[in-house]
Regions:
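Helix-adjacent hinge/juxtasegments
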Residues: 63-104
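Residue-level preference for long, well-ordered alpha-helices that form the structural scaffold
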Residues: 1, 5-8, 83
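A mid-sequence interfacial segment
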Residues: 91-126
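Short, contiguous alpha-helical
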Residues: 6-21, 25-72, 112-172
Length: 172
């Protein structure tokens, strides 16, 4: 068996779902919790993880996961009940990112605020993983800063994912 980025992407997808499940157990006001910047509150961060993954998926594959380029982003998270929709959207975009691990590692022509750039597909896929990890940590910090039960990051580590995938017959 070869070591692949697909397993890291599967971990990312699982950890995203576990984070959303945890948020669904918290009171409504937890969605407005923030660590240091009130513009980056829990609901905004969770939305940002999935919305960014939607954009990464399109950039990597050229296929639309949820939103067309130029269309409005996915809907904001206003209440705990909106997290069920976010979980479905995360499942869609994360599945597309996992599938992209089988594509050739080619240079992609992309645009950002600074203009046109080129990045290897593997770089964008790796950044998608890093981005989600970084912001799940941000969510945990925001919850803890405002006195809500944070997700215990060790519970969504690769160590715990390996236990989960082994118990569920998901190993390659």
């Amino acid at each position: 068996m070869s070591i692949t980025v697909a397993r890291l992407l599967r971990h990312m997808a699982w950890a995203n779902q576990e984070t959303i499940k945890h948020l669904q157990t918290l009171p409504e006001e937890s969605l407005k919790a923030y660590a240091t910047n009130p513009e980056w509150f829990v609901a905004e961060i969770a939305h940002h993880i999935v919305d960014s993954a939607d954009h990464y998926a399109y950039e990597i594959t050229g296929n639309v996961a949820i939103t067309q380029p130029g269309d409005p982003c996915i809907a904001d998270i206003e209440s705990i009940s909106d997290l069920a929709r976010l979980a479905k959207q995360a499942g869609i975009v994360d599945a597309q990112l996992i599938g992209a691990a089988d594509l050739d590692d080619v240079w992609l022509d992309l645009k950002n605020d600074g203009g046109k750039i080129q990045r290897l597909r593997s770089t964008v896929l790796s950044q998608a993983i890093h981005h989600a990890t970084e912001h799940r940590t941000h969510i945990a910090s925001a919850l803890e800063a405002k006195g809500f039960e944070p997700i215990f990051l060790d519970d969504i580590s690769l160590w715990d994912y390996e236990i989960y995938e082994t118990a569920n017959g998901l190993r390659d």
